[in-house]
């Protein structure tokens, strides 16, 4: 499964949900007629989105399976995913792009070749995306995923090169 969004809460009284999409285009999730929801990434529940509207950076979604606010409230925090087989196939070298889930576990080095850590996750801040890096000592560091910092993503060698010092 590839996670493409997160339910942030209910909307209205008819079972609609508010969703933060992790897709390049805000309405990219709506390209998929079937979604899988999970609160633990182990067991998945199939749902069918029937309509949506865009509200700022959020999607307001109607799901066929939910018709009241009480039931929809239980979905807060759940992840929205689709099977990888439903996503467009990308080149292995990453030149056509990559999915966030493919970056988890990749090594991060700076432009001097020094190992910084491994990608533990990514998240969106509104201003830009952020890499969550697991450092060798167990601590985490946040690195902005912007062109000025991320110099290269090499999917073949599973390495991201960043313009970042070890002591930032």
Swiss-Prot record:
Binds ribosomal protein uS19. The keyword Secreted does not apply. The keyword Chaperone applies. Gene3D superfamilies: PRC-barrel domain (2.30.30.240), RimM (2.40.30.60). It is found in: Cytoplasm. The gene is rimM. It comes from Nitrosomonas eutropha (strain DSM 101675 / C91 / Nm57). Keywords: Chaperone, Cytoplasm, Ribosome biogenesis, rRNA processing. Its main location: cytoplasm. NCBIfam families: 16S_RimM. This is Ribosome maturation factor RimM.
């Amino acid at each position: 499964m590839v996670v493409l969004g997160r339910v942030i809460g209910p909307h209205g009284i008819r079972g609609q949900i508010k969703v933060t999409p992790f897709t390049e285009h805000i309405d990219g999730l709506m390209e998929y007629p079937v979604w899988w929801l999970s609160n633990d990434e182990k067991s998945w529940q199939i749902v069918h989105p029937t309509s949506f509207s865009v509200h700022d950076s959020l999607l307001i979604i109607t799901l066929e399976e939910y018709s009241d606010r009480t039931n929809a409230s239980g979905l807060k925090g759940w992840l929205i995913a689709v099977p990888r087989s439903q996503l467009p196939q990308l080149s292995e070298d990453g030149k056509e792009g990559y999915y966030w889930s493919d970056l988890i576990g990749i090594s991060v080095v700076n432009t001097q070749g020094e190992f910084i850590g491994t990608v533990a996750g990514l998240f969106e801040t509104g201003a830009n995306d952020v890499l969550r890096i697991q450092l060798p000592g167990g601590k985490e560091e946040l690195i902005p995923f912007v062109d000025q910092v991320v110099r290269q993503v090499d999917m073949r060698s599973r390495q991201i090169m960043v313009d970042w010092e070890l002591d930032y």
